[in-house]
Design a protein with these regions (language model features):
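Cyclic-nucleotide recognition modules
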Residues: 53-109, 116
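Conserved hydrophobic "DFG−1" position in protein kinase catalytic cores
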Residues: 15-16, 34, 44, 79, ...
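Short, small/polar residue-rich loop motifs at catalytic or cofactor-binding pockets
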Residues: 8-9, 27-29
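Short phosphate-coordinating micro-motif centered on Lys-Gly-acidic
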Residues: 21-27
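Glycine- and acidic-residue-biased ligand/ion/polar-headgroup-sensing regions
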Residues: 30-43, 59-60
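Short alpha-helical segments that sit at the start of domains
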Residues: 117-139
């Protein structure tokens, strides 16, 4: 996405360390961010104090766009590894959307893509069983059932909503059955059946 020049001139690339907050719940919502490198999780707190990951922003993704018209952020944005993020001031971003039709269309396209990805993740989490979630991920997020993971298996398990032990067992069983091939971080679905 090409950022219009007036917005680009006042946007800044910022560096963050692993576990550093980009913003916290209740902070003034004065910017939207784009991940240039790394990964940022948007977190809310459950009543028991546990973190709930509501969004995973990876390289190229925007985050905090839901707060573009809000006075305050509704979640914490925490870097899960060292990150570089582009900070787009909210007022200037709103102005660019209003005044630059081609940018507005690109913005809407990016929001639509993100919404589809979030809906797909919700669909995946509604599936019963680890195998079903793995297959859904490979078919939905990969090309011809092949995905090269950009995260450790333990983090992928969190994204799938399963324990890492359950994920390891499912992957091992699928390999033994000839349903899945693994080569380092690349997973390829070899066959599909009603039993998956």
């Amino acid at each position: 996405m090409q950022i219009p020049e007036p917005l680009a001139l006042i946007s800044h690339a910022l560096r963050y360390e692993k576990s550093e907050a980009v913003f916290r719940t209740g902070d003034p919502a004065d910017a939207v961010y784009r991940v240039l490198a790394g990964e940022v999780h948007l977190l809310r707190r459950a009543p028991d104090g546990a973190d709930i990951v509501i969004h995973r922003a990876r390289t190229g993704d925007f985050f905090a766009e839901a707060s573009l018209f809000s006075p305050r952020y509704h979640c914490d944005a925490i870097c899960v590894r060292p990150c570089r993020c582009l900070r787009l001031p909210a007022g200037a971003l709103r102005q660019a959307i209003a005044n630059e039709p081609s940018f507005a269309m690109e913005w809407i396209t990016a929001l639509s893509r993100n919404l589809r990805r979030q809906r797909s993740a919700q669909e995946r989490l509604a599936l019963k069983g680890t195998r079903a979630r793995v297959v859904h991920y490979l078919v939905d997020c990969g090309e011809s059932g092949c995905v090269t993971l950009d995260q450790p298996l333990i983090r992928w398990a969190e994204e799938l909503g399963v324990s890492h032990e359950a994920l390891y067992r499912a992957l091992s069983a699928m390999e033994k059955e000839g349903v899945l091939a693994r080569d380092g971080t690349t997973l390829r679905l070899l066959a599909r059946s009603n039993g998956i």
